[in-house]
UniProtKB/Swiss-Prot annotation:
Keyword Magnesium annotated: no
Transmembrane segments: none
Keywords, in A-Z order: Cytoplasm, Methyltransferase, S-adenosyl-L-methionine, Transferase
Name under which the protein is recorded: Trans-aconitate 2-methyltransferase
CDD domains in the cross-refs: AdoMet_MTases
Organism: Klebsiella pneumoniae (strain 342)
One Gene Ontology term from the biological process aspect of the record: methylation
Disulfide bond entries: none
A single GO cellular-component term on record: cytoplasm
Gene label: tam
Length: 253
């Protein structure tokens, strides 16, 4: 798959950063020495972490060279590492592991989340936000277009139910807070929904397509979006975007 496009991703910087700030607001740590931002992207979430803990050592982890270059340019006082989140291990336990809209791309959460908790210091926090929109029209329509055009379903899998996360993390000695927030983003058009998702959810479907096939996919996708997202009185469309939040504090080892 082609590398991520930071410019495309940041076209919707405010909308993407808002849940990152909401997640950060629920972390109770006051004294933090080391923070890790898993899937840091272009550094929009890392910037919030630096503002919250100006004296902490902050490390951003991503596997996109383009995203890491953007983040390093924006935040020269943070460390950025090209690494696989599933295999990442810090040199010493971490106070806060923060993952905003990144872990949904990884498989086998039943193995991944206990692995991440194991990297926390006692009283450390794992803070995670993941899009929970697998059943939203924005995503069901991707699968519909792929099926219509004879393409494989390359989208990510649905998230586990909240009770599964709760049991998984409490078994790891964590105190767990889980909630779900639905954002309603006013966007300029149905094309804007497509533009947003070309930076994230549509990427696996578009990967490897030639220009003609890509254009056919996106044209059909926007047609279907228009059927499912009515225009508001001011001509905008409201993109419903549910997100799942998990904050787990490690209180036992």
């Amino acid at each position: 798959m082609a590398d991520w496009n930071p410019s495309l991703y940041l076209q919707f910087d405010a909308e993407r950063t808002r849940p990152a700030a909401d997640l950060l607001s629920r972390i109770a740590h006051l004294q933090v020495e080391h923070v890790v931002d898993l899937g840091c992207g272009p550094g929009n979430s890392t910037r919030l972490l630096r503002a919250a803990w100006p004296l902490a050592a902050i490390t951003g982890i991503d596997n996109s060279p383009a995203m890491l270059a953007q983040a390093a340019q924006a935040l020269p006082d943070c460390e950025f590492i090209d690494a696989d989140i599933a295999r990442w291990r810090p040199a010493q336990p971490v106070d806060v592991i923060y993952a905003n809209a990144s872990l949904q791309w990884l498989a086998d959460h039943e193995t991944l989340f206990p692995h991440l908790v194991a990297q926390l210091a006692v009283n450390g926090t794992l803070a995670v936000q993941m899009p929970d929109n697998w059943q939203e029209p924005s995503h069901t329509l991707m699968r519909q277009v792929a099926d219509e055009q004879g393409l494989p379903d390359r989208g990510r899998q649905p998230l586990l139910p909240p009770d599964a996360w709760y049991d998984m993390l409490t078994r790891q000695g964590c105190e767990v807070d889980i909630w779900r927030t639905t954002y309603f983003h006013p966007l300029a058009s149905h094309q804007a929904i497509s533009d947003w998702l070309q930076g994230t959810g549509l990427r696996p479907y578009l990967a490897g397509l030639d220009e003609q096939s890509r254009n056919a996919f996106l044209t059909r996708y926007v047609e279907l979006l228009a059927e499912h997202y009515p225009l508001q009185c001011n001509g905008k469309v409201l993109l419903r975007f549910p997100r799942l939040f998990i904050v787990a504090r490690k209180i036992d080892v």
